[in-house]
Amino acid sequence: MAIQLSKGQRIDLTKTNPGLTKAVIGLGWDTNKYSGGHDFDLDASAFLVDAHDNCVNDLDFVFYNNLEHPSGGVIHTGDNRTGEGDGDDEQIIVDFSKIPAHIEKIGITVTIHDAEARSQNFGQVSNAFVRVVDEETQNELLRFDLGEDFSIETAVVVCELYRHGGEWKFNAIGSGFSGGLAALCRNYGLQV
C-alpha cells in the first residue's frame, strides 16, 4: 500500500525501495464546474536544478515542448489537453541512474495554460494529486493529495525529488505561484 504524505513531509525513495531506478511521477486533477467558456489545460513540467536551485540551461526544463532531457533521465509522456478521465492526467518518467551528477533536485510543477487570458486559477481545480510508481513493479510507492488550499494561483510546485547522501528523496511541496509558467521559469533561473 502506498504511503500517503502531507504537505511538507519528506520521505526516502531509493533507500527504502532498493533497486528503484525508474519511477513514474503521475499527476492528476479535476476541474470544478466553470462557466468561462474555455477548457482547462493543465501542464506538468520538470525543472532539473543544480546546487543553486537553478537550471543550467533551457534543456533542463522538461515540458510539453521539450519532452526529454538530453540525459534521458527525465521524460514527459505528453500533454493531456483535457484532463478528463480517471487516474493520471500527465506522467513524467524519472530514471535516477541517468540523472547527471550536477543535478541536485527535480522540481515537479503544474501550470494552467493561458490562465490569465482564460480567467482560470487553481482555486477552480480539485482532487489534485501526485503519486510515485515503481515503473518495473507498477507498485504505487507514495501519494500526495494537494488539497484545496489554492485560490488565485496559476502555477504550483507540486513536489521535489532531491539527492541526499547518495539517495533520492521526495518532498511534498504544494506551493502556489501567481504568474504561471513564466514565474516558475524565473524561479528556477531561466530567462523568459
UniProtKB/Swiss-Prot annotation:
Give the superkingdom in one word.
Bacteria
Chain ranges passing through the membrane: none
Pfam families per record: TerD
Family per similarity comment? Belongs to the CAPAB/TerDEXZ family.
List the protein's name: Uncharacterized protein YceE
